């Protein structure tokens, strides 16, 4: 994302310079000045010291070792801790939102250990696919990841073993979903939204309708959503999900509940959600509806379903291909 921003900025500078030159007579000295400014801009953009171990077309990417666990690794995209994996134990889940995604899978998917047909929008460090492979042998998983260089790093430095049970498709997620068969998946996981850049075409009602097409009637859609204290994007995205799916729940993360930036997780299906099983899975990490934590000093997440969810979503925007101001919603 950072690379794209820099590249777009340079293109805009060059375009603006060309337009300015075209509309006036410019001396040789002025032209040299313009060229010098452009050169300084370019050198500045390329020559800035970067913590990147790998600079891809989309990310400044690094892998950090866990100082407290020899087998622990954190994937950093730009300057954000995106994913964590334990190379020796794929069932060890470090991040709150990843544990909630797994809670949703285990609460609403088939019986424990039964294989899944899973699709992932965004790969990260492949943390959830590793978990599913370890806990549900025989699962068939498809990972849709736009950044091929990221895939290389995950395989080479995070020891992901690409076998016949996992297909990795490099390219745009929406185009890839369009190629999937009807009723072919029991699980779709969305983890393509960042805190600084949201691919709006993966947030719209039209795209979610395509996700619903791919899911079986009993399948579930689970997505990680990052937003700020105003929760405008979170509310809009969950409201949009509710336009497509009959049964929806949202788990507001501890950061959101405490009025900060943070992750939340939405769960959706055309079949009733197993709310009791979900509550058991969440335990003390999440409270239900308006209930309060039994420890007032401990900030926890919050699950909203039914009337509580309807009240939360009242007045929220519905995102469509013609109207999806995701950047403004996150910034608002």
Residue ranges and their predicted role:
Residues 203, 236-237, 280-282:
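Composition- and surface-driven signal marking solvent-exposed, interaction-prone regions
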Residues 92, 99-220, 229-232, 244, ...:
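The AdoMet/dcAdoMet-binding core of the Class I SAM-like
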Residues 3-6, 25-74, 78-84, 91, ...:
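Soluble small-group transferase modules, centered on the S-adenosyl donor enzyme superfamily
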Residues 209-275:
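C-terminal substrate-binding/active-site "lid" region of AdoMet-derived donor-dependent transferases
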Residues 79-81, 192-194, 225-227:
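Short, histidine-centered active-site or binding-site loop motifs used for metal coordination
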Residues 1-23:
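Membrane-embedded alpha-helical segments of integral membrane proteins
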